[in-house]
């Protein structure tokens, strides 16, 4: 199939399409104008440190640091950062291969900044009809591997996904790591950081069952939980801090998503108002209990920051929520509220 025809099909699929961006680094060879995934036989992944920084502006910063070991002679390998096409955004596919919701992409190899090229790639889909083929944006670079240890560091920013019942979603591909020689990550660390904000999120525990998430900075709580409509998850509340998961000999058998907790409780009318809260623009209060809504709307921003309420009924109300983490030293100030929180304050008057 010619590349021009591939792009024409992609336009049909993606048009009318929420922002979903998945990513990891993989190995490719070039076939015409296309990049084709391949298996690397000499180079293994010794270490990966993957860090997400979540903000209230709707963006996530991603920092990935790898240590690779090349058991063979020096060689140049084409590596690629993969990101799926946006879904339900109405964006046409970009023939230049630049993803519309990724920016600030950088890559360093053994301390040297590398240039990269952009491509649209069709992953292997042998059983999918032509009209339903899916496409991937790839940021590709030539990595000059020397024999022995090599280090790769890349960063980028992308707009987080969201939905009717999701304030934010951060999907990520881990499975491309299986294309390297050892078919595992010898030493893997996942960090999720929320500087100067609070985030309440969860990750399905299937992939992460071999270890526990730990709060290593700031204020936070972690527990295993299963909501009425959810699989078993790691439920995490984090304020101005970082949570970490670490595993050796990690086999990434699946991909994962960092989901805001409202994805499991957003449509449950039995859940109290305020059971989920986020400071970002896509947080919505579902007015199932209008009698208390104004008090809750007005005070949610301060509860998020740990305010200890003088009104006993309010204090008792917020104490029922896992995300509420009291801080007796916190003194509220209206100038610290996000634009969305200022609107909540006005709604609660």
PLM regions: where:
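Post-signal-peptide mature chains of secreted/extracellular proteins
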Residues: 248, 264-349
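N-terminal, polar/Ser/Thr-rich
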Residues: 21-58
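Ligand-binding face of N-terminal immunoglobulin V-set domains in extracellular IgSF glycoproteins
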Residues: 63-84
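Solvent-exposed beta-hairpin/edge-strand motifs
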Residues: 80-116, 182-226
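Bacterial N-terminal signal peptides that target proteins for export
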Residues: 1-8
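Surface-exposed, acidic/Ser/Thr-rich flexible loop segments
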Residues: 88, 134-211
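Bacterial N-terminal signal peptides
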Residues: 8-17
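A surface-exposed beta-strand-loop module
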Residues: 105-169, 233-255
């Amino acid at each position: 199939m010619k590349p021009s025809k591939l792009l024409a099909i992609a336009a049909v699929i993606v048009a009318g399409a929420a922002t979903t961006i998945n990513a990891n680094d993989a190995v490719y060879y070039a076939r015409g104008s296309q990049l084709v995934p391949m298996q690397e036989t000499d180079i293994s992944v010794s270490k990966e440190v993957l860090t997400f920084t979540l903000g209230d502006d709707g963006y996530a910063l991603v920092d990935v640091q790898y240590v690779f070991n090349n058991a063979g002679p020096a060689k140049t390998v084409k590596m690629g950062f993969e990101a799926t096409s946006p879904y339900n955004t109405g964006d046409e596919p970009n023939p230049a291969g630049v993803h519309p919701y990724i920016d600030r992409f950088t890559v360093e190899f053994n301390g040297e900044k590398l240039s990269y090229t952009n491509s649209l790639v069709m992953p292997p889909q042998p059983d999918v009809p032509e009209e339903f083929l899916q496409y991937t944006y790839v940021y590709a670079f030539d990595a000059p591997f020397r024999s022995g240890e090599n280090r790769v560091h890349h960063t980028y920013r992308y707009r987080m996904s969201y939905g009717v019942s999701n304030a934010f979603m951060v999907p990520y591909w881990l499975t491309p790591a299986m294309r390297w020689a050892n078919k595992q990550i010898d030493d893997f660390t996942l960090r999720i950081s929320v500087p100067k904000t609070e985030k309440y999120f969860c990750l399905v525990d299937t992939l992460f069952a071999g270890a526990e998430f730990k709060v290593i900075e700031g204020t936070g709580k972690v527990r295993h939980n299963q909501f009425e409509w959810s699989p078993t998850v790691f439920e995490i509340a984090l304020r101005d801090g970082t949570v970490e998961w670490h595993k050796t000999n990690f086999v990434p058998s699946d991909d994962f998503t960092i989901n805001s907790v409202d994805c499991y409780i957003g449509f449950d009318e039995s859940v109290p108002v305020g059971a989920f809260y986020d400071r970002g623009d896509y947080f919505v209060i579902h007015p199932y209990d209008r009698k208390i809504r104004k008090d809750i709307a007005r005070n949610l921003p301060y509860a998020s920051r740990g305010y200890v309420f003088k009104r006993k009924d309010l204090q008792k109300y917020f104490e029922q929520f896992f995300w509420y983490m009291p801080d007796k030293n916190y003194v509220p100030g209206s100038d610290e509220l996000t634009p969305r929180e200022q609107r909540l304050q006005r709604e609660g008057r």
